[in-house]
Amino acid sequence: MLNPDKYKNVRRPEIIRECTACKTRGGCMTDLVCHTAPLENAISILKCGSLLSAVNARKLPDTVLQKEDRSAANDPTDFFHYVMFSWGNCQAGDRLVMERKLGRSPSSDEMSAGFTPGVRFYFKYDDLDKHPQAIHDGFLPIKVKDEVKLADYVYMIVVPFE
């Protein structure tokens, strides 16, 4: 990240109405943030007791992770050193789970029929914001370098029924 202090003192909005994907609630709810994982990854997360950055979870260098097909967003190498979070009611995490399942971006039909939801790890934004490695990049609500211990920060885990 080029300028980590740029967004350091940005206040959390109560709701983000510009988001058109969250029609039911009229925008992104900001009291919670979420990390979404496919079931097999969620099992590993629970066994480990922490959400780990990609370099820590997969034990591969950031340059290798950046070149993988699953890194379709052309993310910079520092991306792989952070645990990423979306707003609590955002579908972005489930979209990523489906993208990894299909090997491509899912259509709107695939996000309803045949949809495979991820396991959602919820955190209170204001608590996670106090994590010593939490930063704001102006794109994601929050991201945390290296690791988030579930025992210290998790608020709720939602596992889909099927």
Regions found by a protein language model. Give the residues of each.
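NAD-dependent ADP-ribosyltransferases
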Residues: M1-E162
